[in-house]
Amino acid sequence: MKLQEKNPDVFKNDQSRRLSNEYLAKFCRDVPVESSESIRADSELLPHTDDVYRASGLNELAQTDPELAVQLALDLISRSKSGGAIEMAMDFLHQKNVNVGLGHENFSGGDAHRSLLRAQEIAAQMVSCDYSRLCGPDSLRAWVECVQPGVCQPGVSMQLIWQRSNSPQIYEAAVAIANQLRAMRRQP
């Protein structure tokens, strides 16, 4: 029996990886060095870079004041306009096993906690994508992240990756949690 007959996904992932490599090579070739340097310089002037700095220090802060670190992480999730800060804050809360109080109603049973954490992680990414242009069709983030689940194809987006690499229950819960986060963020 051939390897392809045993596991056809191996070859699907190879094709996905090849498509991703082709896209990334073209992307990197088409971006002038000056452009990426000016983007980096401009990003340092953006007001939300403080949030990224604060989010990157959550683990250090937790060593001296764990309650303040958790409060800061929750604040970043509910108020920051930095996608990176939102994702880092959610990751921190998960590392510390902090209950963020979103999505529990969507899961029960033995795998409930792990599924809930995954749905919350995806929800944070969805909200993060609201503040960047990195998640749409043919975006750099999508082409980088599509390799692992093997879904690289022209027009790939984070939405497609989330749908295809998670169970319908996790994906639907993530959408619901992301909507809860968005509603929470709209409140003054």
Per-region residue spans from a language model:
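Short helix-capping/linker turns of helical repeat alpha-solenoids
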Residues: 1-101, 131-142
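Short, flexible coil/linker elements and helix-boundary hinge sites characteristic
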Residues: 7-8, 65, 97, 128, ...
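Exposed acidic/polar residues on beta-strands and adjacent loops within beta-sheet cores, strongest
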Residues: 87, 96, 118, 187-188
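Mature extracytoplasmic/lumenal regions of exported proteins
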Residues: 95-156
